[in-house]
């Protein structure tokens, strides 16, 4: 069977460097048998084609023959690849392989009009141009593949010299055709195929995966991230034994073609000058179905053909030429690998991401042992979990042992053999991601993933999956190799140092999207329970302190914690109960500190987000009558609740001394917090009213040094106002002094202005002189301010000092007309007319006289005119009425006012406030225009008022006529 693989003898540089002949023969026989069955199936299909009807449409084989005849002049010898029957050196009748060839692309575009049924090529013209440009430089060392001109008439996808039985990895239609730089063009010489070569030639026979990967638009969009991910830094290459070893890294990509037809192909990339691997580019149709993106986040690896496990595993695989070159012990290498992995970030931006295989020849035997289990599937393999977990940073744990869940302890090689695309589990290594926080899961489900889909969320961390065969067979395991906290920390570094994140290549589904998932989940969680999260709640250590219980979110922190820290396995904040530690971990790891599911808040508690049983009972039990003494220990919690706050307020009005003392003792430590609470501030206000005098004083002392910030706060300003009303004078004065220097700021604030008003109302004038003096020179400005106008009105009401009154009124009276028309200033003028001195009202009315009609038609000034009619004297009122009637019989000013939307109210106010003589005069003038007024919307209002007045006058006259005869 071995000769069928196209193998040739090779000159061995070192007899001890190759794998055993037994392994090679065994693998060769297995692969040869698979190829033989494939050939038999193709032969059977070709025989069946002989019986096709003559009227059937042409087949691809016929097109191949025609293409070969056209290009070779009938013989078709130079284009053996087009011959469907030539299995030895051609494409073997594979339609997709045939359609990928650049020669077929030229043939297709030349003959597509002659034969419309020709299958379209899998390469675009852009791909062909790139390939042709690179074809001219294929004789340069370090070019793309081994593309030396063995036959000038051969296709671009020619084989390496001396190998007629297998195609090389250059048959891919995307990365290799696009000019993937870095594949050395060294000749193969006489080297014999190694185990890795044979293995790579048959890499495609893995389990099918249902989902197709999402592909970037072009290789150029993706190459920067992939190249950076697959370049080994110097420190990552240290310790490789042989001077010129084989080093493999799977480089995967997408096509430049604009159509989505071509499937991604996998080739082997050699990042260092070495021999080109053989047989790594062939992929069967089965393989193409295996290239599925399993990540639910559609990360940057979504366009890759092979798993990230394969990239990491083969990138450091060293097929050394000498078994004894590395004489260091296993423990020394393990220590070095841990040190290089954890601190490799100092040497290069991507060193942390490189997972190396141990540099020992017996690693091949471990890989072979894992290969036997590579076809085993876990019980939950699906689009979310391909049946194998993400490779552990400790690559030496390639044990074939399987545990209760049928997963390998470290399935790195198993994943590689099965050609699965990584792992999309919501692993706990994402410290900032609360993906594990789905409700309905406790710590016993952490190894099972989503409850609904049955996926294994923590499969990649290998938590608790130790077989009962661990002590009896397989590779020996060191306890430190399965420390779950190191796995978590290492993978967090690996994710956060991904160069694709440095380039902002998020792909729509990266680590940043996980943060969005966290926010979305937190919002959904809050809405589900409907209870705001509280801080400072006592912890219940009997509950799970796990993010899966939904009580809080996990945030990044050191995963290597002390037993007294929340991350400790034995900490009360541990994701597991104490009795689960023995169940989940072997004895070798039970004494390790550090949590398993990410860092946890020191003050996190299950009680956060859930109301106490007492409060819930109070709100649910409507029939039972509660007393204040029954909620002892829950006063603060009740105060922060809408119904609990109302209950305390009602009970405080009739509470006994003991009950008041109980409430006082509980609210005092949290007084400042409750003052700014939407419901708690009412409890504080009520306690200021009904608390004992000593308690009120002590509570007022809590306000000192906090008066200004509380005055500017929506709920705190109410507490300050209540305190200014009820506390003793000395405390009032002390509180008010804290506003000195901030008066104007408070006046212009929507909350602070109420505090200033309360100070003017409740504090003696001599103690607030600093407030009043601040207003001098700014009265007009404040009068036109939405909040300042209220403060000026309080000054006019409560400040009786002659000097203060004269200064304020002087500024107001100097701008009466302007203030009367201002949306806020008109209230100040109205306040002066209502509460001012008679001489001040006279000044205002005389200022408005001559502009009454104009002012009456203005929205805000019309209110001022009405106040003039209401509070003015008889002489002042007569002056205004005469101006409204005008000097002619037509009464033009009166007609205009009755038809105006604002002035008609002034006319109605005149009819209400004037004496009988003036009212009779006005009614006589209005009756002349009564019919015309009914045609106007606002005139109807005046007509209705007149009719009411007439009816009232008639009733009054009738009543007088009845009373006069009786008196006679």
Curated annotation (Swiss-Prot):
NAD found in the keyword field: no
Compositionally biased tracts (Polar residues): 211-220, 227-238, 291-303
Classification via InterPro entries: ARM-like, ARM-type_fold, NABP, PUM-HD, Pumilio_RNA-bd, Pumilio_RNA-bd_rpt
Positions of region (Disordered): 1-25, 138-171, 204-240, 260-303, 360-382
MF-aspect GO terms: mRNA binding
One GO cellular component term noted in the UniProt record for this chain: cytoplasm
GO biological process: regulation of translation
Extent of the Pumilio repeats: 630-665, 666-701, 702-737, 738-773, 774-810, 811-846, 847-882, 883-924
Keywords on record: Cytoplasm, Phosphoprotein, Repeat, RNA-binding, Translation regulation
Domain of life of the source: Eukaryota
Residue positions where Phosphothreonine is found in the record: 261
Modification Phosphoserine, positions: 194
CDD domains in the record: Pumilio
Chief site of localization: cytoplasm
Entry text on domains: The pumilio repeats mediate the association with RNA by packing together to form a right-handed superhelix that approximates a half donut. The number as well as the specific sequence of the repeats determine the specificity for target mRNAs.
Name of the protein: Pumilio homolog 1
Source organism of the structure: Arabidopsis thaliana
Gene behind this protein: APUM1
């Amino acid at each position: 069977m071995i000769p069928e693989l196209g193998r040739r003898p090779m000159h061995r540089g070192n007899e001890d460097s190759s794998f055993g002949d037994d392994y090679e023969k065994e693998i060769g026989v297995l692969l040869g048998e698979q190829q033989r069955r494939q050939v038999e199936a193709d032969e059977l299909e070709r025989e069946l084609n002989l019986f096709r009807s003559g009227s059937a449409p042409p087949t691809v084989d016929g097109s191949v023959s025609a293409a070969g005849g056209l290009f070779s002049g009938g013989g078709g010898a130079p284009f053996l690849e087009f011959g469907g029957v030539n299995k030895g050196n051609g494409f073997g009748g594979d339609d997709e392989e045939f359609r990928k060839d650049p020669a077929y692309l030229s043939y297709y575009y030349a003959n597509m009009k002659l034969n419309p049924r020709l299958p379209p090529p899998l390469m675009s013209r852009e791909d062909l141009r790139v390939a042709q440009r690179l074809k001219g430089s294929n004789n340069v060392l370090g070019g793309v593949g081994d593309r030396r001109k063995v036959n000038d008439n051969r296709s671009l996808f020619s084989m390496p010299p001396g190998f007629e039985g297998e195609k090389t990895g250059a048959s891919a239609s995307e990365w290799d055709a696009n000019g993937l730089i870095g594949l050395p063009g060294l000749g193969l010489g006489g080297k014999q195929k190694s185990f890795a070569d044979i293995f790579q030639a048959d890499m495609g026979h893995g389990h099918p995966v249902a989902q197709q990967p999402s592909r970037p638009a072009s290789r150029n969009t993706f190459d920067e991230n992939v190249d950076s991910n697959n370049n080994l830094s110097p420190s990552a290459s240290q310790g490789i034994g042989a001077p010129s070893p084989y080093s493999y890294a799977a480089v995967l990509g997408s096509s430049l073609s604009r159509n989505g037809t071509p499937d991604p192909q996998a080739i082997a990339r050699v990042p260092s000058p070495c021999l080109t691997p053989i047989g790594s580019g062939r992929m069967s149709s089965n393989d193409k179905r295996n290239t599925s993106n399993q990540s639910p986040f559609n990360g940057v690896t979504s366009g890759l053909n092979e798993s990230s496990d394969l990239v990491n595993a083969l990138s450091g695989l060293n097929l050394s030429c000498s078994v004894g070159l590395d004489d260091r012990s296993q423990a020394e290498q393990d220590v070095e690998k841990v040190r290089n992995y954890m601190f490799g970030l100092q040497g290069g931006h991507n060193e942390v991401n490189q997972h190396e295989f141990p540099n020992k020849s017996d690693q091949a035997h471990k890989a072979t042992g894992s290969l036997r289990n590579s076809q085993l599937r876990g019980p939950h393999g699906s689009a979310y979990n391909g049946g194998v977990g993400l490779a552990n940073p400790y690559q030496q744990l390639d044990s074939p042992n399987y545990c209760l869940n049928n997963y390998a302890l470290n399935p790195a090689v198993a994943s590689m053999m099965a050609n699965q695309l990584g792992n999309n589990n919501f692993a706990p290594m994402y410290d900032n991601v609360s993906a594990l926080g789905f409700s309905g899961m406790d710590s016993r489900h952490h190894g099972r993933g989503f409850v609904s889909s049955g996926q294994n969320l923590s499969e990649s961390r290998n938590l608790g999956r130790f077989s009962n065969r661990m002590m009896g067979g397989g590779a020996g395991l060191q306890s430190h190799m399965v420390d779950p906290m190191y796995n978590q920390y290492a993978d967090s570094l690996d994710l956060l140092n991904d160069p694709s994140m440095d380039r902002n290549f998020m792909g729509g589904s990266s680590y940043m999207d996980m943060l969005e998932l966290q926010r979305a989940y937190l919002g959904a969680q809050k809405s589900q329970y409907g209870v705001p999260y509280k801080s400072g709640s006592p912890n219940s250590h009997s509950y799970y302190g796990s993010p899966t219980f939904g009580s809080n979110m996990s945030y990044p922190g050191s995963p290597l914690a002390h037993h007294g820290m929340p991350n400790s396995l034995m900490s009360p904040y541990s994701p597991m109960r104490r009795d689960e530690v023995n169940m989940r971990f072997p004895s070798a790891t039970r004494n390790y500190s550090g949590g398993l599911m990410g860092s946890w808040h020191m003050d996190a508690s299950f009680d956060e987000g859930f109301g106490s049983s007492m409060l819930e009972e109070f709100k649910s039990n409507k029939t039972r009558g509660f007393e204040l003494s029954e909620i002892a220990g829950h006063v603060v919690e009740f105060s922060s609740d809408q119904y609990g706050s109302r209950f305390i307020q009602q009970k405080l009005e009739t509470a006994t001394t003991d009950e008041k003392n109980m409430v006082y003792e509980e609210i005092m430590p949290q007084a400042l917090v409750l003052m700014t609470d939407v419901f708690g501030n009412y409890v504080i206000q009520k306690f200021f009213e009904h608390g004992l005098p000593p308690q009120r004083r002590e509570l007022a002392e809590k306000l000192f040094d906090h008066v200004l910030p509380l005055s500017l706060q929506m709920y705190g300003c109410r507490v300050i106002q209540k305190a200014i009303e009820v506390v003793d004078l000395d405390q009032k004065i002390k509180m008010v002094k804290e506003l000195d220097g901030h008066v104007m700021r408070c006046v212009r604030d929507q909350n602070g202005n109420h505090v200033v008003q309360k100070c003017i109302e409740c504090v003696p004038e001599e103690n607030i002189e600093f407030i009043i003096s601040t207003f001098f020179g700014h009265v007009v400005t404040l009068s036109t301010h939405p909040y300042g106008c209220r403060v000026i009105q309080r000054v006019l009401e409560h400040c009786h000092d002659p000097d203060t009154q004269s200064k304020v009124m002087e500024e107001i009276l100097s701008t009466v007309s302007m203030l009367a028309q201002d949306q806020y200033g008109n209230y100040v003028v109205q306040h002066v007319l209502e509460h001012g001195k008679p001489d001040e009202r006279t000044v205002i009315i005389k200022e408005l006289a001559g502009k009454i009609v104009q002012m009456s038609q203005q929205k805000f000034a019309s209110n001022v005119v009405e106040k003039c009619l209401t509070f003015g004297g008889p002489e002042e009122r007569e002056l205004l009425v005469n101006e409204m009637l005008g000097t002619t019989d037509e009464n033009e000013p009166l007609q205009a006012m009755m038809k105006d939307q604002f002035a008609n109210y002034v006319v109605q106010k005149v009819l209400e406030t004037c004496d009988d003589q003036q009212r009779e005069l006005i009614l006589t003038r209005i009756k002349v225009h009564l019919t015309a007024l009914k045609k106007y919307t606002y005139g109807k209002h005046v007509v209705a008022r007149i009719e009411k007045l007439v009816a009232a006058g008639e009733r009054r006259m009738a009543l007088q006529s009845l009373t006069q005869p009786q008196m006679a």
